[in-house]
């Protein structure tokens, strides 16, 4: 599968940089597909490089050449003894935590104290059981485990955990409950992306909540598509 990320225009006049939000999701989705693929015109920045390092630790090979990232793997994804040091990228860890805890039940991440504080200030404890130990040089070893039952997904502080859980749709049919009737733009972007690889969504709105059911019966491994949006370098 090849994904081309098209730079959009802000208000129709200013060229926006390629979206790192799309690049994160493309890297993760391709890594979960059997035959992987290529990302054309990706955003190469600190955040997306961190996502690639995490995927590399899981046995995914990523090669950057001529503004294309080639994503491949030779076997099932593996759980490293710990994921490589991450100083600042909340996006990478929030999007991947739902996936690695689903695949491996628990995982260890070497992170900075600053990143640990950012994670714990954005509902980490709502979705995962965790323990941590302080190391030298202001580093933290974070052990994260899958909760027995997933609660309502909170969208107030960040939708990145929620997007990570939605990305699980590539692996299995799922049901998610959100604490809002309005889904934020980044979550809708994730849904749009997943629909392009064949995931079907059933979205049911109640008075103050939204239920999203996902079905991967028609998952596509070989379809090429383009994505476009005004997300630039923002993250939410």
Can you say where each PLM-predicted feature lies in the sequence?
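Structural preference for solvent-exposed beta-strand-turn elements
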Residues: 1-236
